Amino acid sequence: MLFGLVGSEMCIRDSRYLGDYVKRQTGADLLLWGGSCIVHEEFKAEVLLNLKHQHPEAKVLVHPESPASVIELADIVGSTSQLILAAQELDSSFFIVATEEGILHKMRQSTPGKTFVAAPTAGEGATCVSCAHCPWMKMNDLQRLIAVLKAKDTQVHIDEAIRVRAAVPIQRMVAYGQQRG
């Protein structure tokens, strides 16, 4: 059962890697879109394996939007909040982290005395050889959020029939989140 939908198909549009991970974990019948995250797609197993050999004591924390070959090398796979929690709870002092680089600051803040190294990116689309930088995530900040909330012209108008149909999956996501605590 996935999201309370027994025997239902579900489409995952954001990341084929995340969808593949969910499919392998749950056995759910998922329709996977060909999309991916530009950061997570750039992590490569062979490059991560080289870094693991340099730091055999390291625990590897991987976001599930990464390719399956990278996930296979992980000690922990999880959302950013799950990776932060794992870093706090695991009895290791050295971590290799395969997700957007911004998470490293939060990890260092919440677990002083532990070392965090960004997993290297290696693909053609990488913004640099060893950084997992998402330019779009950096566009969102508190000042811009406040500006949008204060602005009078930022309303989005949706046709009522579309709103009614769109409310169903949103209500399911909220209900699922409430069930999970």
PLM region descriptions:
Residues M1-G7, C11-I12:
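Single conserved hydrophobic/aromatic residue that forms the stacking wall/gate
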Residues S8-E9, P56-K59, L90-F95:
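Short active-site oxyanion
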Residues G35-S36, V62-T80:
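Glycine-rich phosphate-binding "P-loop"
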Residues V39, P64, Q82, D91-S92, ...:
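C-terminal functional extensions of proteins
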Residues D75-D91:
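Donor nucleotide-activated moiety binding/catalytic core segment of transferases
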